[in-house]
């Protein structure tokens, strides 16, 4: 008898087949060693669209809302019928007695497999392959420790709840507000509160009022001491005058030894954030690069929310660290003795451990990788080396001075042990990036009571700074914390989406026209801001959405009831539909298309706008309209263009070439003159160019 192994994509199936000795390639699967290995192509099975439940749902109408399928039905994804039929045929083979789910080890991978298994109506036993690396050794080890598929029932229920909740909120809210505002408005359970955070930040920037302030700067032995802020420039100048040339006394010197522990390893979100800061990569680009490196067996599983390793990995990671330390530019690090203990925490690893390089690093040609993958791979290597290095230790020095009855402060530091920052500095220099040294350079050796004569003082002007627009780096952080700042590293986070879905959420907002990229910044568009303005709090609140996400996590762990979760989603959808049945006239204008003014109405002086069929005065009571296909134009095989209409409104005439004469069966050129008598229809006259007089006096 044979086991059928189903992977999520062809490249993964190929790696599994190679590792397990299934070397014979057939049509749609590999075979060998008592195994059949095939693959999905992402989601083969999807929830049925609303129109599939009832013909009337194919049209978007308020009266049909809310649409609440019971039970949910599923269909094959368009274009993937052959892939599904191949899997169903393999499942039905009489020599197959067991199915192995080898889709990605996470919520979405579980859903991809289960929906195919259910639609194929397969009832054969299921085992689960759960691995965090595509290395041959990891695949073989995982296959020797297959777990019962039933162990992942809670994870499957969590995935189903996520999918159903997204469908219910997306279908009903999108149809509701699109019908009300006469424009397609895509509303999503997670993307809309993310948009709300962007809109809130944009509003803070718009409303920000900058304020001027001044600082006094005192120069002492090459060091600079700074005063408190002065909001009154005259007061600052007066203080500077008192200090210039006056004696300066050092009133205190404090020295404090400080220690910065090595950074933690990467989870997906922190990797995406740092890749955005250093390389400008979008969250999706980083995920794509990391996924490719995972499939090339160079990185461990990327869709993780853990920044720690498990205790059984200590020996392996120690070997990987020594291999990474041999790679340029890290081979220039000195006195490096890896400390693995700080990276180990079994309680902080649930499904997958932190992202690290694999043992394949020894055989890989890193220089041959595409630039994006190479940068990301070296970034992960750098983090692994930093995380296993000694702490960074320094002495923080603060010196205060008195001059002309004003206090000044100078800050500096003296490095005691560079520790992990040496590795970080070498990597940043390699990238031609400025090393992160923190505040303050080395101060002279000031002593309390020390005096200086003839103070040099300058006044500098400054302005308070507005909040900065979100970048993918800072937005990912906000999504992870549901917009709440100052959350301790060890606190339980209730975020928007998951590490695996946040990149797609950002891309959806951009694709829908609600967000634009401006360099590294993410800026909400007018349509995006208006959408957030009209939607109710349950759809825009980051904290409420994060609570839903937390409940999904609890369901996956077996700690919450799926039915209770779905009841809450259904209640929210029903309440939103019943609350919003009509909108004001002002509300309808929010999403009215912006019209270009092409001229001024000759009758009333109001703006004239272009419509689909005409150019009309914005004051409907005026009645002035230029029709694009007026009989005057169609009889002459012409259409009134925007340029022609602009000329008519500005100059009262427009020159037209190629006018058709039905009588002469030929074309001619002429000027068309606007002849408005104030009636319902506009009249036009033709004016022909005068012929030039020849030398003999003839025309």
Placement of each model-derived feature along the sequence:
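Metal- or metallocofactor-binding catalytic centers and their adjacent structured scaffolds
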Residues: 233-266, 272
């Amino acid at each position: 008898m044979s086991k059928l192994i189903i992977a999520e994509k062809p490249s993964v199936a190929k790696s599994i087949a190679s590792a397990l000795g299934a070397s014979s390639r057939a049509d749609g699967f590999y075979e060998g060693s008592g195994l059949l290995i095939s693959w999905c192509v992402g989601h083969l099975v999807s929830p049925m669209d609303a129109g599939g439940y009832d013909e009337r749902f194919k049209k978007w109408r308020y009266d049909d809302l809310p649409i609440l399928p019971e039970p949910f039905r599923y269909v094959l994804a368009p274009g993937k019928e052959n892939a599904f039929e191949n899997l169903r045929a393999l499942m039905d083979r009489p020599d197959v007695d067991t199915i192995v789910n080898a889709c990605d080890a996470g919520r979405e991978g579980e859903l991809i497999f289960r929906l195919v298994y259910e639609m194929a109506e397969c009832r054969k036993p299921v085992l689960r392959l759960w691995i965090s690396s595509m290395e041959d050794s990891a695949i073989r080890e995982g296959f020797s420790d297959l777990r019962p598929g039933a162990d992942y029932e809670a994870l499957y229920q969590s995935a189903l709840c996520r999918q159903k909740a997204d469908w219910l909120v997306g279908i009903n809210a999108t149809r509701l507000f699109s019908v009300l505002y006469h424009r397609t408005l895509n509303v999503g359970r997670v993307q809309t509160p993310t948009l709300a955070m962007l809109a809130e930040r944009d509003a803070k920037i718009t409303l920000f009022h900058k304020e001027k302030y001044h600082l006094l700067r005192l120069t002492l032995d090459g060091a600079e001491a700074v005063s408190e802020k002065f909001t009154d420039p005259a007061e600052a100048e007066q203080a500077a005058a008192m200090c210039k040339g006056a004696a300066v006394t050092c009133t205190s010197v404090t020295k404090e030894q400080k220690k910065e522990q090595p950074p933690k390893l990467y989870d997906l979100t922190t990797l995406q954030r740092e890749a955005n800061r250093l390389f400008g990569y979008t969250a999706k680009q980083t995920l794509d690069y990391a996924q490719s490196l995972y499939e090339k067996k160079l990185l461990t599983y990327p869709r993780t929310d853990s920044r720690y390793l498990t205790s059984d990995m200590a020996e392996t990671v120690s070997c990987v660290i020594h291999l990474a330390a041999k790679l340029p530019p890290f081979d220039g690090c000195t006195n490096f003795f890896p400390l693995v203990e700080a990276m180990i925490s079994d309680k902080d690893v649930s499904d997958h451990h932190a992202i690290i390089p694999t043992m394949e690093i020894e055989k890989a040609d890193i220089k041959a990788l595409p630039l994006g993958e190479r940068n990301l791979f070296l970034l992960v290597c750098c983090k692994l080396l930093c995380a296993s290095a000694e702490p960074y230790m320094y002495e923080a020095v603060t010196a205060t001075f008195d001059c002309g009855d004003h206090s000044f402060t100078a800050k500096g530091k003296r490095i005691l042990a560079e520790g992990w920052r040496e590795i970080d500095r070498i990597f940043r220099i390699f990238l031609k990036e400025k090393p992160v040294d923190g505040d303050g350079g080395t101060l002279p050796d000031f002593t309390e009571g020390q005096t200086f004569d003839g103070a040099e003082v300058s006044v500098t002007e400054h302005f308070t700074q507005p909040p900065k627009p979100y970048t993918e780096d800072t937005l990912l952080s906000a999504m992870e914390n549901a917009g709440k700042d100052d959350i301790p590293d060890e606190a339980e986070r209730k975020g928007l989406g998951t590490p695996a879905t946040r990149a797609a959420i950002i891309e959806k907002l951009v694709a829908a026209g609600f967000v634009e990229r401006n360099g590294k910044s993410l800026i909400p568009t007018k349509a995006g801001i208006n959408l957030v303005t009209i939607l109710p709090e349950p759809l825009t609140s980051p904290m409420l959405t994060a609570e839903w996400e937390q409940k999904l996590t609890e369901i996956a762990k077996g700690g919450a009831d799926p039915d209770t979760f779905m009841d809450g989603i259904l209640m929210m959808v029903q309440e939103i539909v019943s609350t919003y049945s009509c909108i004001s006239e002002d509300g309808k204008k929010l999403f009215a298309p912006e019209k270009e003014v092409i001229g001024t109405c000759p009758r009333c002086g109001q703006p004239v706008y272009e419509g689909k069929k005409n150019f009309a005065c914005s004051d409907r009571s005026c009645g002035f309209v230029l029709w694009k296909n007026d009989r005057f134009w169609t009889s002459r095989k012409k259409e009134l263009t925007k340029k022609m209409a602009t000329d008519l409104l500005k100059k009262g005439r427009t020159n037209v070439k190629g006018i058709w004469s039905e009588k002469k069966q030929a074309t001619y050129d002429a000027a068309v003159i606007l002849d408005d008598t104030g009636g319902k229809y506009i009249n036009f006259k033709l004016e022909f160019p005068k012929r030039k007089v020849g030398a003999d006096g003839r025309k």
